């Protein structure tokens, strides 16, 4: 399959800092391979069997059923998962959708179910088709999309973007750019300029952000998933305008406005449908988690800011696993940082319904049931990128392998690591031709700056003094190994609630409470469950107490309760006065907190491994 990640000669688009490698160039290994395997065995691999909207009746495979976004959403995760795993069963599941879509094109270029003419779901389908083409080389995709985009350019002045499509126009442009880089068709640039003009001007909104408080009224501009998808807007616009620094400033303004006003300890921003503030009991929608990861990957690839990789890892290794059951059959519509009862009870302030915090097949709107599947596969496929100098870049760390051409030579890379549960990353470079010279760009996380070190082919260690990029350019020989040591010390983060959260490297830690899962309705494996605490949750951290790092072997599912391969032991005390506010925790008591309860040793576990947890805790006197 041709690799179009290198810049096309004569392209009118600004080159990204790190171009996306085609689907399949990066594949999961180690515990990440296990994670995707669990996903294939869980809901993603069987959704059409248990949920008609993504089964044979879906209008996106010629049926008489759902004709809007659910089929496209599902494919946006199913297709990359199938190709990353080379899973024949998953590929067979996707095939009827792909074949029907490609056969549905009308003479004017429009396509899809006749019952629905919304631009928005076709934006998702275009992303699906570009991934399918990258992985398979299907020659039908480019002509199909050319016909569709010609139709879109002709029709948009008469039938402009509206509602969801207006909020999410940037995703449409991504596929337009993909096609332009392969065909050079000038009209695609006209379409890429028109789409953002018809969309919401998100950067203008962020520069004077009016939505800093928790929102109580519906508007597309406060919708949490729209916000997550909008993050990529500056990246999309700057490639055509070449105003890279202006759009970088817009990106920074957006990140500051959103996370300062609504950021949570686990790395995401809150929105239990609408932007919801910083309180640890406000919800975070699963769709927003997976869409934020994809948007941040686009931002990192476009602008090259290493801190975006830190942000990606924080979300992927905390909020992403937390939103599903360990077997990846069930999910929550909304998760909470302080989550001690996942019950069908209306939470104060939430616009989402009473079931949104439970685990099930469709605990609230079905968008998350359809859309959650892209989270892990797209994270894996964006772990590496191609730098402007022709080298390769490690954008986020995790066990994987890479196979691509570098300066005309096939090169394989094996990234051997149990990161983020361990601090060491080994990168083994295997060029087909010994002695090929190219740069390797290695991201230095903020938490490792000054303490990290890098060893190349057994030479003397090099200190990683500053966060950003450490570049190694050399003549690579098969088996040359780069070893990164990225040590991280546990740290307490003061939160707006008055409580503290604990982080170590990319992992956020929580006090994980023993869990009692109760089936409420339906049949396994897609029954609806509430989850209750099987022990006390109201602990505070002793002020000034240190942390002992404890490790265990990394199991197949490191995000299962009781299976955490990395834990922090510290001292804590019960706080009897810290109780519930309805079904959620009350705000952490304001320090200084005095309690007569004895000091105990408590263990904190990675956030993603605890479905009943307290992440923001009060500090108590020792």
Language model region names:
Residues 2-4, 17, 54-71, 110-125, ...:
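Solvent-exposed loop and edge beta-strand segments that line ligand/cofactor-binding
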Residues 2-70, 88-110, 139:
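Low-complexity, Ser/Thr/Pro/Gly-enriched N-terminal "stalk/linker" regions
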Residues 24-26, 30-32, 73-88, 124-138, ...:
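Well-ordered alpha-helical scaffold segments within catalytic/enzyme domains
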Residues 236-261, 280-328, 339-340:
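Catalytic-core region of carbohydrate-active enzymes that cleave or remodel glycosidic bonds
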Residues 251, 310-318, 323-422, 428-431, ...:
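C-terminal beta-rich recognition modules with glycine/proline-rich loops and embedded aromatic residues
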Residues 435-456:
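Beta-strand-rich binding/interaction modules
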Residues 449-475, 492-497:
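Solvent-exposed beta-strand/loop surfaces of large extracellular or lumenal domains
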């Amino acid at each position: 399959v041709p690799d179009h990640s290198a810049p096309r000669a004569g392209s009118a688009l600004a080159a990204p800092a790190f171009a996306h490698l085609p689907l399949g160039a990066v594949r999961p290994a180690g515990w990440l391979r296990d994670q995707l395997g669990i996903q294939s065995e869980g809901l993603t691999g069987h959704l059409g069997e248990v949920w008609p909207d993504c089964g044979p009746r879906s209008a996106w495979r010629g049926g008489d059923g759902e004709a809007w976004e659910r089929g496209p959403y599902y494919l946006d995760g199913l297709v990359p998962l199938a190709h990353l795993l080379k899973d024949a069963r998953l590929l067979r599941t996707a095939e009827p959708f792909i074949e029907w879509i490609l056969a549905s094109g009308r003479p004017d270029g429009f396509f899809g179910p006749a019952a629905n003419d919304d631009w928005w779901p076709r934006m998702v389908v275009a992303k699906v088709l570009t991934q399918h083409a990258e992985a398979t080389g299907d020659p039908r995709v480019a002509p199909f999309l050319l016909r569709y985009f010609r139709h879109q350019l002709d029709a948009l002045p008469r039938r402009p973007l509206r509602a969801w499509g207006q909020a999410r126009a940037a995703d449409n442009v991504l596929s337009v750019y993909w096609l332009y880089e392969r065909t050079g068709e000038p009209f695609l640039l006209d379409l890429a300029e028109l789409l953002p003009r018809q969309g919401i001007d998100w950067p203008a909104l962020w520069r004077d952000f009016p939505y800093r408080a928790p929102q109580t009224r519906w508007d597309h501009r406060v919708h949490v998933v729209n916000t997550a998808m909008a993050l990529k807007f500056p990246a999309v616009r700057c490639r055509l305008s070449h105003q890279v620094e202006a759009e970088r400033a817009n990106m920074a303004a957006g990140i500051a406005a959103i996370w300062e006003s609504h950021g949570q300890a686990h790395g995401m921003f809150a929105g239990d449908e609408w932007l919801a503030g910083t309180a640890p009991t406000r919800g975070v929608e699963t769709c927003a988690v997976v869409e934020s990861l994809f948007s941040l990957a686009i931002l990192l690839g476009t602008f090259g800011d290493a801190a975006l990789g830190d942000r990606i890892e924080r979300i992927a290794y905390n909020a992403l696993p937390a939103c599903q059951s360990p077997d990846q059959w069930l999910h929550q519509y909304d998760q909470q940082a302080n989550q001690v009862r996942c019950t069908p009870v209306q939470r104060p302030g939430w616009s989402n319904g009473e079931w949104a915090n439970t685990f099930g097949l469709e605990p609230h709107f079905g968008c998350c049931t359809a859309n959650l599947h892209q989270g892990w596969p797209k994270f894996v496929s964006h772990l590496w990128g191609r730098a402007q100098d022709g080298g390769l870049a490690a954008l986020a760390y995790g066990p994987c392998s890479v196979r691509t051409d570098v300066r005309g030579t096939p090169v394989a890379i094996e990234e051997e690591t149990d990161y983020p549960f361990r601090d060491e990353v080994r990168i083994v470079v295997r060029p087909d031709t010994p002695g090929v010279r190219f740069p390797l760009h290695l991201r230095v996380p903020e938490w490792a700056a000054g303490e990290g070190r890098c060893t190349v082919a057994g030479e003397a260690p090099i200190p990683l003094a500053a966060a950003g990029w450490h570049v190694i350019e050399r003549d690579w020989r098969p088996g040359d190994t780069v070893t990164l040591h990225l040590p991280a010390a546990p740290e307490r983060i003061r939160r707006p609630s008055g409580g503290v959260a604990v982080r170590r490297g990319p992992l956020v830690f929580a006090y994980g409470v023993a869990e009692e899962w109760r089936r409420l309705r339906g049949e396994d494996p897609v029954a609806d469950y509430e989850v209750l605490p099987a022990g006390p949750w109201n602990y505070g951290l002793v002020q000034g107490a240190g942390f002992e790092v404890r490790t265990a072997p990394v199991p197949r599912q490191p995000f299962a309760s009781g299976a955490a391969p990395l834990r922090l032991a510290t001292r804590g005390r019960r706080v009897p006065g810290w109780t519930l506010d309805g079904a959620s925790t009350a705000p952490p008591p304001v320090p200084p907190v005095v309690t007569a309860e004895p000091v105990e040793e408590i263990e904190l576990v990675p956030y993603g491994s605890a479905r009943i947890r307290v992440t923001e805790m009060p500090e108590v006197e020792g």
